[in-house]
Each structure stands twice: as C-alpha cells, then as structure tokens.
Amino acid sequence: MESKIRNYYAVKVTGGQEVSVGLMLEERAKTNNIPEIYSIIVPPGLKGYVIVEASGPHVVKLLIAGIRHVRGIAQGLVPKDHIVKMVSKKVTGPTIKEGDLVEVVSGPFRGMQAQVVKVTEGKGEVVLNILESAFPLQVTIPVDQVKPVKKT
C-alpha cells in the first residue's frame, strides 16, 4: 500500500474567526467521515488563516465548501518547517533567578515587592518572600505575574 501524502494548505478566513472556523472544519471532517484530513491547525500568531493537513487540495475544497467565514484556499503549500515554527513553544520574558528582587504585577499581591526564593521552571512558578508584609510570608505564583526589579 502506498504511503499517504501529507501536505499543509492555508485556508483564508475572516480575521478573528479562526478558532470558530477551525472547529467547524473539524466537525465537518468528523460528520462527513473524510479520512484524508489529518489535522486542522489554528496558529496563535497567524491572523486570518487556518492550516489544514490533507492529502490534496481537492479534499480541502470539499471540506471548506459552504462554510461561513471561509474565503478560500491560499495558493501553494505551506512548508512543514513553517508549521513547526508556528506551533512550537517560544521561551519569552526575562529569566528570574533565586535572590532576585521582583514586583508582583497581577493577583492579590499586585504592586508588592518580593524576593525570589525558588524558581520551578517545569511548572512555570516562583516561590516569593513578600517583603512588604508585617510577618514572613511565602507565596507561590506563576512566573508571568512577576517582573524583575533588581538582579542580584
């Protein structure tokens, strides 16, 4: 048996409707039992497009026919390395180390200064010692809720 050819096609959609169109395409692929659709990707940073992994453009045209907010298929194929870049997790933001002085930017401790006691990178959390409290107070909050004030 031949190996299935998998190509990525960009489907043009109305801006802001990417998630709803992606869900409608998924539902249609399931109800119409279209096995040539392998995946439907809604890239977070790409406005106005939904990526469909399929065996050919005729399958994608069959899938998108009559769906609201779909404007057509973009010409050509999307290279696989572009897809990997779009969906891979990007490490952003400043790195915070133990002993750094930080300010809490959201949550119940917003605006308070704290010292970093421990950083758990796997969970994306930091354990802080709040400096502005009357007694020693340690809290664990997500790393995106703090910003560095002073490095040690």
UniProtKB/Swiss-Prot annotation:
One of its GO terms (cellular component) is ribosome. CDD domains: KOW_NusG, NGN_Arch. It comes from the Archaea. Stimulates transcription elongation. It comes from Acidianus ambivalens. The lineage of its organism: Archaea, Thermoproteota, Thermoprotei, Sulfolobales, Sulfolobaceae. The keyword Hydrolase does not apply. This is Transcription elongation factor Spt5. GO terms for molecular function: structural constituent of ribosome; translation elongation factor activity.
